[in-house]
Amino acid sequence: MFDFDATLPLMAVQFLILTVILNALLYKPLGQALDNRDEYIRTNLQQAKERLQQATELAQQYEQELASTRRQAQALIEEARVEAQKIATAEIAEAQQAVQAELLKIQAEIDQQKQATLQALEGQVASLSEQLLAKLMA
């Protein structure tokens, strides 16, 4: 059934030589290529994580700067609104004073014209009374 002659040790030696040759020519370079590929993937993954972290930090920084800028813009808008309100209030007060002064001036002119008209009418009443009396007597 099984012969133990010189072929068995020769096959064992051939197997060992083939194993050494395959190990030297195929398995080690293939293992090294797989190790290099694994290292390349790990390196790229680590770099991607670092870039993602940097991008996240930059995004947070930009968000904070944007929020700060928005707050500053809102403060400037509020300040401008308050200033415009002050200016409008001052101009309204100035216009009211000008209108009040004009009203006083017009009232004074009306009073003066009223007095002049009353004096003229008093003078005419006296002369008309004399004319009426003269006509009635005549």
UniProtKB/Swiss-Prot annotation:
Keywords of this entry: ATP synthesis, CF(0), Formylation, Hydrogen ion transport, Ion transport, Membrane, Thylakoid, Transmembrane, Transmembrane helix, Transport
Top-rank lineage group of the source organism: Bacteria
Pfam families given in the database record: ATP-synt_B
Lipid bilayer topology: Single-pass membrane protein
GO molecular function, one term: proton-transporting ATPase activity, rotational mechanism
Keyword Aminoacyl-tRNA synthetase: no
Keyword Repeat belongs to the record: no
Record-annotated membrane-spanning stretches: 6-26
N-formylmethionine: residues bearing it: 1
Annotated localization: Cellular thylakoid membrane
Cellular component, GO, one term: plasma membrane-derived thylakoid membrane
InterPro entries found in the cross-reference section: ATP_synth_b, ATP_synth_b/b'su_bac/chlpt, ATP_synthase_B_chain
Stretches of the chain forming a coiled coil according to its record: none
Quaternary structure and interacting proteins, as annotated: F-type ATPases have 2 components, F(1) - the catalytic core - and F(0) - the membrane proton channel. F(1) has five subunits: alpha(3), beta(3), gamma(1), delta(1), epsilon(1). F(0) has four main subunits: a(1), b(1), b'(1) and c(10-14). The alpha and beta chains form an alternating ring which encloses part of the gamma chain. F(1) is attached to F(0) by a central stalk formed by the gamma and epsilon chains, while a peripheral stalk is formed by the delta, b and b' chains.
Family indicated by similarity: Belongs to the ATPase B chain family.
Function: F(1)F(0) ATP synthase produces ATP from ADP in the presence of a proton or sodium gradient. F-type ATPases consist of two structural domains, F(1) containing the extramembraneous catalytic core and F(0) containing the membrane proton channel, linked together by a central stalk and a peripheral stalk. During catalysis, ATP synthesis in the catalytic domain of F(1) is coupled via a rotary mechanism of the central stalk subunits to proton translocation. Component of the F(0) channel, it forms part of the peripheral stalk, linking F(1) to F(0). The b'-subunit is a diverged and duplicated form of b found in plants and photosynthetic bacteria.
Entry protein name: ATP synthase subunit b'
